[in-house]
Structures are given as C-alpha cells and as structure tokens.
C-alpha cells in the first residue's frame, strides 16, 4: 500500500509500447473478470426494485454462475441499500462483494461499514471527469477533480486493500486528462480502474482507442486492472465491451439480461458467450459456468418483472428456434449449419414436455430447476399440491404459472398478516398519504405514511414498512 503524499510522476503524454492485448491462440487464454452490477445498476431500471430476500437469492445465483465481483448496492443511498449490501457481504463466499461510494468521506465510510464483514470486500469510488460534468455538475476545474479523486481512493484504501475507481463519463473525457487521473489514482492505491461509457455514447473503435491509450500512456497501468462499464443507449454496450477486451481490458462490468438505467447495460450473457464462442479471436476466458446462464436470466426476469424479449441473443426463447424450412432441413442434417452455440451450453434444454394434470412430481421439479428455482423437499411438495389443484382448472400449465407457485415459497412471511383495510388521501401534484390496517397474528396493527409516486406506490410502501419485507 502506498503512503499518503507519495508524489505522482505525470508522463501521460509520452506513448509507451506494450505487447499486444490478445495472446496468440496457442498461448494460455488471458483471464477476464466478470463484474456483475445487477443488484446496483440493474436495480435502477424503472420498476426493477427488489427486496432483501430477492437480492440475496440473486446474489447466491451469481456466485453459482461464477461471477468474480458482485456489486451489491450503494450503501449510503438508503437504509435498504445499506442493509442489503451488509447482509450480502456477510453471507456470500466465492466472489468479491463490492459497494459503491462517491469520492467523499461519508460515502466511503458508510460503504466500508456495510462491507466490513465480507470475505472479499471491495470499495468502488467514482467521480465525474468529463468537461461537461466538471463545468455544469461539479463546478470544479481539472486540478480540483484530480485532488478529490486521489483523496477518495486514499480514504478507501485506509479501509480496504481492494479499491476500484471510476472516472464517470470517461468516454467523453479528454484523453490527456483521463490518463492523468488514472495515473494519479493508481499511485494512490486503486487496484482496478474502471472506464465507464456512462451515457452510451462511445463506439467500438473509440473504446478500443481509449483503452489502448491508457495502456500506452499511463506509466503505472500494470499495477491495476483496467475495467470497462458500457451503457446501451445506442445499442453498442456489448460491442464496446468486446472492443475494450480486445484492447487489453481485464474486467467487464455487466448485468443479467442487460437491465439497467435508461436503455440498460452490457448484457452479461451476451458478452460472456461472445468471448467463449470467439475465443479463437479474443484469446481470453472467464470463470462463468455458461450452462447456468438461462436459469439465472429467468430468475432475474421473474424477480424484477422485466421479461426477456423472445428474440434476445443467448437467453431469448427464440434464440435457438428455427422455423424456415431450409434452416430446419440443415439442422436435421447437422446442427452446426445454423447454430454457432449449443443451447445446452447456456442451460437451455430442448424438450417437448408439456406439464398438465397428469404430470408427476419429478417433471415439476425438473421444470422448476430449469426456471432457476432450487426447492427443498417440503417446498416441492407444497408447490406440487398447488400445481395439481391449478392443473384441474387449466388445460395447460405455463412457465409463468410454475414460477408464480415457486415464488410463493420464497416470499413466505415470518408471521401471519391479515389485511383489514386502508385509507388513501391524495390530490393532484401532492404526495399521497396512506393508512394501512392489518392483523398480525390476530393483533391489530396500523401504519400511516406520506410517500410514493401515486396512491398504488404509496400502498406498497406502507405494506413494506409494516411487514418489513
């Protein structure tokens, strides 16, 4: 660890020659870290908020999937975010657990408070660096931004040996200044430097140029892992991430199903399968167990309510569907004529099995597992009994029905609540007030709150406050 006050030698403008990022196919593939931010950036998708139990379920699925880093949340953002980061950090093993913080002492200390019991903690600090952010958001000059970035990393290193720094809006930051910032934060102790395309503005050739420039012009770049975090506003998040890997990036930040703010983030399943399918080109490898991609994708879709488009690459229901006669003929003769990936490699099993009232417990358990649910024997029996009752009323049971029955097992309340009634007071432009009344194990309980984006949201917030889920 570097001591405070170590001078930084700025030699960013002098190009340095390095070995090519991609190794020849005959060499051992270069490892690429997968940093999943479904629980933080992904949750910023409108309507994608998750409770603690759901976040914990996704976190455990991400560990099983093989991700290297789980960004569990932004601890200072809310008490709920703090609790989820704290509980996930304490429970998860097998992956680094990361918390986000701005470059100020309060954020960083709060992040560490949430992460302190993690087996492998990481503090991720960020500060905008582009000229438009410096002028209009931060109202700071280059020297002030540089000093605050260094101070943030230095503070984080006092708590944690693993510190990531992100120059927000890096893709629109002047390359000379970006190189100076990266060199300074590495000297201050950053172990990962993440390059975000915050607004999804970059192109693949531009992203390649930025990463290559950092590798060539930052003298101490070998002391940190270069990461990339791309948004999908122009539909280029995956392409930009692949270009960054090709230029030498060692970590890709992404989300399951590509969910995230606005148009979303780089899709984990797409970038992972691109790197695996075209390993001949990229000469890299990840730790991802790809056969768990589809189950994890469906789990996240079921929890967030953001369904996967049928034609989405890798995990969409049509990703391995062939209807054209010529394609079907080729597939019957040799699958490789029209398939560059095997469906079983991503966890999609081709089956004509239709579940109905004559189906058995084993078939139901197999389908539930394929949808991403690990049921205990007791949970399976409960779901099976409910499934049989439903099958008597419906000719055919769909995946959504099975998922709904399984979700009931994971959403069970620790105590019995009986709904009694509610009162809502609202007006145009006003924040609604809700009074919710329930019986908790026969004892009357009530709560009144003034919050929410409309009466329905307010009711759900009241339920959450009263029940604690």
Kindly give the residue locations of the regions a language model identified:
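Active-site beta-loop-alpha junctions enriched in small/polar residues
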Residues: 40, 75-77, 100-104, 126-130, ...
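Hydrophobic faces of well-ordered beta-strands that scaffold small-molecule active sites
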Residues: 34-37, 70-72, 95-101, 121-125, ...
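Catalytic alpha/beta core domains of metabolic enzymes, predominantly
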Residues: 202, 209-322, 326-333
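N-terminal capping/small domains of soluble enzymes
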Residues: 2-4, 8-104, 352-361, 365-370
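Conserved mixed alpha/beta catalytic, RNA-binding, or beta-rich assembly cores of soluble enzyme
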Residues: 430, 448-468
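A mid-to-C-terminal "edge-of-domain" accessory segment
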Residues: 24-32, 36-38, 273-275, 279-443, ...
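Alpha/beta enzyme core
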Residues: 45-68, 85-91, 105-222, 242-247
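Structural signal for hydrophobic packing residues in well-ordered secondary-structure cores
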Residues: 63-66, 89-96, 115, 119, ...
